[in-house]
Amino acid sequence: MEIDERKEDVVEVFTEYLVNNGLKKSQERYVVLEAAGKMNGLFTAAELHTYLVNNMNFHLSPATVYSSIKLLLQCGILVGHFLSSKSVMFEYAYGKTSFKYAICSKCGRISPIHDRTLDRAVSVVKTPRLHFNFYKTYIYGICASCARKEKSKLCKIQNKNKK
């Protein structure tokens, strides 16, 4: 029941946005909204397009997907993440107040951070004349896998130099 109510809320928010901005309430836009809600975690526009074609058997042009994503960003249903120079990642944002990720500087692996410490810290921050809706935090470093590879490579170099 709660999921259905939340889905109805999202559709209502999107419909209100379209009406208030004099935009067409097309089936394609609502299908993109539905697909975005079914995506797990971060996704690219190309991945959303592929999902629409392969999982929902709904064929849209990439341009329609991109323009619908733009509308979903503008009304706050999606949030965009510029995590690399390659492309923008999107995430379903409705009802969320924080987006926290650890990003490996070597391989680019992106992992969600589930620690609530940041949430508690942000909740006590005073922001005069600003009521914040959400926040994003990106922590960059080297993941355990890349650290092991680096250590292994360093050991090989040291062993080679000893000979």
Label for each model-derived stretch:
Residues 44-57:
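DNA-recognition alpha helix
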Residues 77-163:
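Non-DNA-binding regulatory cores of transcription-related proteins
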Residues 38-44:
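Short capping segments at the starts of secondary-structure elements
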Residues 1-38:
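Intrinsically disordered, low-complexity serine/threonine- and proline-rich regulatory segments
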Residues 36, 65-76:
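Basic amphipathic alpha-helical segments that dock to polyanions
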Residues 26, 44, 64:
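Ser/Thr-centric signal marking residues that sit
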